[in-house]
Structures are given as structure tokens and as C-alpha cells.
Amino acid sequence: LGARLWAYQAERFPLVKHGVLIAAFGASATCLSALLRGGAPSVLAIVVAVLVLFGFFFQLRVADEHKDNEDDTKFRPERPVPRGLVTLAELRVVAIGVGVTQVALTVALDWRLLGPLLLVWAWMAVMTKEFFVPAWLKKRPIIYMMSHMAIMPLIDLYATACDWLPAGVALHENFGLTLGAFLLLSLVNGSVIEIARKSWAPEMER
């Protein structure tokens, strides 16, 4: 199983490539929060934010494997799950194990962070189910994209909360407004990246 999972990550979730980007993403969000409140983030806050965010993005990959399994089997049979390299059940077990680690890290920093953690998981769960209206969403690509990209501000909220929540900063006045603008920007940036990622040349369409 270990060898198969290693082969899977190389194709669908390259640890080094994704890890560097996620580390920069998580650390910058935590540091921004500290900058806005006029302090410095703790090393523990940065470490927890980066590791938990890494877990989020892996779980999003697993969620996508489940959500897109029917289409992948039909149109992209060369991918790891359709061709039988790993099973959805095996990926679920790994994702649950990652979730246990996320809870442990979160509680080690501040138990109140369980709120933002559960919020991300809740959105991820309904997103995997296409908000229970898959046919309706697929006919409305803009709404589809925005509903899925809405998870990005929630992930950013968790990352910033790793700093401001243990520091006892309330979300009000200038701090809250600036943080809100940052979260909105993360939604816009995520949407732009998603549009670029899903834009295919005509000869690559299936």
C-alpha cells in the first residue's frame, strides 16, 4: 500500500511541489494576521497552520477523487483511481488519519480553533456532494465555481486564526475589516487560478 500511495502522490498530489506552495500560503496568512495586530506569530502557530493546511489540500484532492470518479472512469481512465492503483476506500482511510492529526495539532495550539477546522470540513463535505444539487450547479458554471472556491477563504480563516485567536484579538474595527478584505481576495485569487487550471486547448478536451 505504501508504494502505491507514493506512486499516487507523485501523480495527483506531489508532496514537495504542493508542500512548498502550501507552506508559503499558510505562513504568509499567519504572518499577515500578526502584522495586522501589531505582533509576531509564534513558531507553533506557523507550524500548525502549515501542517493543517497541507492536510486540507490533501483532503480536497481525496474529495475530488470521489466527486469526479464517474467522469474520470469514463473520460480519464489513465488516472490512478480509475486504473486501480489505489481505491477510494484506501484514500478515505488516509484522509481520516490526516484528520486525526489535524485535530491533535489544532488542540495543541488552541482548542477554540476546532471551530474554524470544523467549518472547513463541513463546507468540504457538502461541496463533495455538490451541495446536493449537482445537476443544477453544473448548468451554472459561475455559481459552481464560486461555491467550490468559497472554501479558500475558510481555509485562510483557519490559517489566520492560528495567530489571532490564541492572541485574544477580536474581529472588529480595522483588524476585522482588513482581514475580511484578505479573505475576499483569497476567493478572487482562487477563482482566477481555477479558471486557468480548467482552461484546456481544444485538442486536449475530452
Task: Report residues per predicted region.
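Multi-pass alpha-helical membrane architecture of UbiA-family
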Residues: 1-206
